[in-house]
């Protein structure tokens, strides 16, 4: 009986320790996210920077927290499997550049909005959801950042990486996937890459 009691107590201790680690991980990620936001806000408010320099600094600051490569892969769905390595590399490069330009332009339009973290929690194994409100005088936008933890660390990247962003319930990744799927029903992947080059 005493042996069973000890095993139960050990199991409880392990569970409490695991919960403590999980809470610490969520807290660390939340603080890291807010630190990044503060960093970007300082860049945006720096009037000594030209627009190109400002956007370059924004991209440099945000890139380590995004898994643009995974986003590129997921956006193509089954078409990804049909590509050789050279075409995969080319598409990823074009997609990453497109995403960087999109994020820098959106952030560059910042006008004293306030970012508030409303919730952060594990959604499933190696997945975390961080929900925020972007508060301005006119409106409040709910923006959700979805993180995953790569099995292997990626050079010059954070441990937890954003692989999708939802703005007012609309997933950027799903929107890209739907757009690319419709395009590829009548055109080739090479024509899609030509369009991305033109942008």
What residues fall within each predicted segment?
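A mature extracytoplasmic/lumenal domain signature
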Residues: 95, 119-121, 132-136, 147-149, ...
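Surface-exposed, charged secondary-structure patches
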Residues: 101-141, 199
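Low-complexity, intrinsically disordered terminal/linker segments enriched in charged
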Residues: 164-199
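Sec/Tat signal peptide C-region and signal peptidase I cleavage site
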Residues: 8, 17-25
